[in-house]
Structure formats: C-alpha cells, structure tokens
Regions:
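A short SAM/SAH-binding and catalytic strip from SAM-dependent methyltransferases
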Residues: 1-17
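Short, hinge-like loop/turn segments at secondary-structure boundaries
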Residues: 2, 52-56, 137-138
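Short catalytic/ligand-binding loop motif for oxyanion handling, primarily in non-cytosolic enzymes
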Residues: 10-12, 43-47, 130
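Short, glycine/charged-enriched secondary-structure capping and boundary segments
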Residues: 16-19, 50-52
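SAM-dependent methyltransferase
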Residues: 36-108
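C-terminal lobe and adjacent flexible extensions of AdoMet/dcAdoMet transferase-like proteins
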Residues: 98-144
Length: 144
C-alpha cells in the first residue's frame, strides 16, 4: 500500500479522522503486507514553524504561510499563487487549512497498536535517514 504526500493520510484535521484512516490501512494489509507513507514531520513543525516561504515555479510564484498550533499539534497552512506576467496584489491568506501533524514517535505508537511495525524512516527519496530537522517524514512499515 502506498500513500504519498498530498494524499489523505496525515492530511486530515484531527486525530479521530486520521485514526480512522490508519485503521483502514492496517485492515487492508495481510500479515507481511507493506505500507509506505510520506507525511509532513510534526517534530520539524515544533521547532521550525511558524514561517513563510516562497517558491519560484515554472509558471508562477507561490507564497506559503505555515502557522503552528502547538497544543493541537496542528499546522494551519495557507498559500497564494501569482502567475508570471500578471499584476501583483497584497497577499491575503484569510483562512488556512488545518492539518494534524505527527512525529515519528507518535506514528510508531499508533501503528504498534494497530499491528504495524515501523521498519525504517526517511527524510527524502534518496534514502536519507529521517530527523527532526527535515520537513518530510517517509515511513516504511509492515503488518505483523
């Protein structure tokens, strides 16, 4: 089973909704079944958010705001896109999307209760080991 960034898992607003999805993963896998997911790292958010970033893409500029609700471990994400060649206006990010982020320790605890064992974790597709200083958290697990 494969779950990549911008998918449903790890991108829902609260623990209840995410736990429903985690349970579906566990039930869908046979013993020995493998799961790989790519989520934003909650440990990174604890020390690096709030922040604002910009990304110059091929067709436009994206301004992103990352706010952090520490008590809920929830990212409030907003963005504004500007297409090259169009007039700029003052960015207003009225409402952001709330996303509950998890640390590797939290995912390990949740998965353990569901019969999933974490085999490895990475920070990117090169195989770099995960750390609290990397925004991506890729987790490889097996159903036991």
């Amino acid at each position: 089973m494969l779950n990549m960034a911008d998918g449903a898992i790890g991108y829902l607003e609260d623990d209840g909704e995410n736990h429903k999805i985690f349970s579906v993963i566990a039930k869908a896998l046979k013993n020995g079944g493998k799961h790989f997911m790519n989520i934003m790292n909650g440990s990174y958010a604890q020390t690096h958010f709030p922040c604002k970033l910009w990304d110059a893409g091929e067709k436009g500029l994206t301004l992103s705001a990352f706010e952090w609700e520490k008590d809920r471990k929830t990212l409030i994400y907003g963005q504004v896109d500007y297409m090259y060649g169009e007039a700029l206006y003052k960015p207003e990010m009225k409402e952001g999307n709330p996303i509950r982020l998890y640390s590797l320790d939290e995912i390990t605890e949740i998965f353990c209760k569901l019969g999933l064992r974490i085999c490895n974790s990475f920070a990117d597709f090169s195989g770099k080991p995960s750390s609290d200083n990397d925004i991506q958290l890729m987790i490889y697990s097996i159903r036991e």
